[in-house]
């Protein structure tokens, strides 16, 4: 029997076993325990450790997250275990190239547990508390081991905190190659609505690509219009979390619509620029559609005028703002909003919109951030400005998106919250100092009042419109 080091086998002899039962509606989970002896448990964990570390390319983890703040669906995480060092390297489909190595341990806590017990930006992202999510976003980094199958190479896990079931499957390529592929699939999947029929009954739905939620509406007729065509209303709503796969998407639990259960849907990723057909193994077919106001990256380069309000309700217009391609397909450098700095606007390929988000401002024409006294970085801070108060958050997901008016000849955009948070709605921005001193009581230092936007000051309240002039 392979002997694990003391740290990674701590407390095994002291714990009992917990017979964890899998939910029948989920994937099949096989239990392997037939006695509670410390010897058998030690062997069980030793064999699992060898299995994890012995896989040539590593593992794909179906990582599902969510709590009372909302369900955030499934994320593909690529893992490579080094069972000699007790280390794991993790990559997420949400980040193209970042690979992070930390420690893991096989132990017990009311049953056998796989614990990622040192901080890892990928594995702890959704389970770490923040100012916005006080208990994290329902992610786990400790998992009950429900079972594993050496022959079929699958490991079944259940989150200790959120109770979500997760699977580990072996990869057929290095984790960097797999992650790069899933990053592109994740980035290019922006179908927002769908429709179709099941057994002659009409189905429509929405896809929340940010939070990986698939919502189907069972439709019923309630009459006809003047031309005799049926009128429909929603009879029932079904929402299930999903995770993307190399072929399409897979549901956390079967999607049950008009008595038909659908476990997964395949679709062609090459159809990103047009309507997409979803197909299930049982022959169910849905037609997916991209957002009506979706625009390609190339559309946005040009010159603009921006109008924003002030705290007194009047409007200020900044003319001659230029959007210059920075990283193709990803973002634009914004010039003309200030003589003291440049900004970046991100392109969200899922929504076909440009977004202004939290960021460190840049020195004009350079890739260097603006910093005062070698300590205070000037940042553009999302601001939830209201009639009586205003909240500030340092979160790179937060910001505002430019919603197109649908006119290609005279394109104009309305600024709206980008949906980066379920708790916070950005209406404005201001310039602030971020204190890099780790001993400071707070990274929020003070307003950066020595910096200003063209024709105004350090505040950018109530963004209104963004009009393309050429």
Question: What are these regions, as identified by a protein language model?
Answer:
Residues 2-4, 26-113, 156, 162-164, ...:
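Acidic/polar, low-complexity intrinsically disordered N-terminal segments immediately downstream
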Residues 7-15:
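Sec-dependent signal peptide recognition
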Residues 174, 178-470:
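Ser/Thr/Gly/Pro-rich, low-complexity flexible regions
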Residues 20-24:
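C-terminal motif of bacterial Sec signal peptides marking the signal peptidase cleavage site
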Residues 82, 107, 146-148, 324, ...:
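Short beta-strand micro-motifs enriched in acidic
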Residues 60-66, 85-87, 117-123, 307-309, ...:
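Generic short beta-strand segments
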Residues 87-235, 239:
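Long, acidic/polar, low-complexity amphipathic helices and coiled-coil-like
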């Amino acid at each position: 029997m392979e002997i694990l080091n003391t740290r990674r086998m701590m407390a095994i002899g002291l714990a009992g076993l917990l017979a964890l039962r899998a939910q029948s509606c989920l994937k099949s989970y096989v239990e392997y325990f037939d006695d509670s002896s410390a010897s058998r448990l030690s062997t069980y964990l030793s064999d699992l450790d060898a299995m994890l570390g012995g896989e040539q390319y590593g593992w794909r983890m179906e990582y599902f997250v969510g709590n009372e703040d909302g369900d955030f669906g499934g994320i593909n995480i690529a893992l490579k275990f080094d069972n000699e060092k007790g280390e794991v390297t993790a990559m997420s489909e949400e980040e193209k190239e970042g690979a992070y190595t930390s420690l893991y341990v096989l132990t017990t806590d009311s049953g056998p547990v796989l614990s990622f017990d040192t901080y890892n930006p990928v594995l702890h992202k959704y389970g770490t508390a923040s100012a916005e999510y006080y208990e994290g976003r329902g992610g786990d980094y400790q998992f009950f081991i429900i079972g594993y199958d050496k022959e079929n190479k699958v490991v079944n896990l259940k989150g200790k905190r959120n109770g979500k079931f997760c699977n580990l499957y072996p990869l057929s390529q290095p984790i960097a190659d797999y992650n790069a592929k899933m990053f592109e699939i994740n980035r290019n999947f922006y179908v927002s609505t769908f429709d179709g029929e099941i057994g002659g009954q009409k189905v429509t739905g929405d896809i929340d690509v940010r939070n990986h939620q698939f919502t189907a509406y069972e439709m019923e007729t309630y009459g006809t219009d003047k031309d005799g065509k049926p009128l429909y209303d929603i009879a029932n709503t079904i929402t299930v979390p999903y995770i993307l796969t190399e072929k399409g998407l897979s549901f956390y639990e079967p999607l049950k619509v008009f008595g038909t259960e659908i476990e997964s849907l395949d679709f062609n990723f090459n159809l990103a620029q047009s309507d997409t057909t979803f197909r299930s193994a049982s022959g169910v077919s849905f037609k997916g559609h991209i957002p009506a106001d979706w625009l390609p990256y190339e559309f946005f380069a040009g010159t603009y005028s921006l109008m924003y309000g002030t705290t007194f309700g009047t409007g200020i217009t900044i003319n001659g703002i230029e959007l210059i391609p920075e990283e193709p397909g990803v973002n634009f450098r914004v010039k003309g909003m200030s003589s003291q700095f440049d900004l970046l606007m991100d392109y969200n390929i899922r929504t076909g919109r440009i977004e202004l988000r939290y960021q460190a401002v840049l020195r004009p024409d350079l890739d260097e951030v603006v910093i005062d006294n070698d300590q205070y970085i000037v940042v553009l801070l999302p601001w939830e400005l209201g009639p009586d108060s205003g909240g500030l958050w340092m979160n790179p997901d937060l910001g505002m998106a430019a919603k197109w008016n649908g006119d290609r000849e005279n394109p104009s955009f309305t600024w709206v919250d980008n949906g980066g948070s379920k708790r916070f709605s950005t209406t404005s921005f201001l310039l602030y100092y971020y204190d890099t001193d780790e001993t400071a009581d707070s990274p929020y230092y003070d307003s950066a009042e020595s910096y200003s936007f063209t024709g105004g000051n350090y505040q950018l309240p109530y963004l209104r419109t963004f009009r393309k002039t050429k």
